[in-house]
């Protein structure tokens, strides 16, 4: 069931943000295998460009639908890939995503 859930999330994100997504990464306690039934599902969406308000609304709709369908809290953050590449070696959060992240989808 979890793979189906992740596939559905990836599909929803890609539909909400066409041509912007570079990769989608699961990180945090679920990726580390230290999650509990109450843990949120941390997702980083790496983008080629910033989101406008309409894109933010579409992504929010996907996340809310997933939260309700699976009775989980999906914590989805967007990261502009150029900013990530510039700061990944010095920002602890980015280093954690690199170290523990599981890539759910990547652009070809």
Language-model segments: which ranges?
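Catalytic core of pol beta-like nucleotidyltransferases
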Residues: 1-22, 32-37, 48-108
């Amino acid at each position: 069931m979890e793979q189906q859930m992740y596939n559905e999330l990836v599909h929803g994100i890609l539909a909400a943000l066409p041509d912007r997504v570079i990769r989608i990464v699961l990180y945090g306690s679920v990726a580390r295998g230290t999650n509990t039934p109450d843990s949120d599902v941390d997702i980083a969406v790496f983008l080629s460009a910033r989101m406008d308000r309409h894109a933010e609304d579409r992504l929010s709709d996907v996340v809310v639908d997933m939260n309700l369908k699976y009775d989980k809290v999906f914590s989805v953050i967007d990261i502009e890939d150029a900013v990530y590449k510039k700061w990944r070696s010095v920002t602890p959060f980015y280093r954690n995503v690199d170290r523990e992240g599981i890539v759910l989808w990547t652009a070809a």
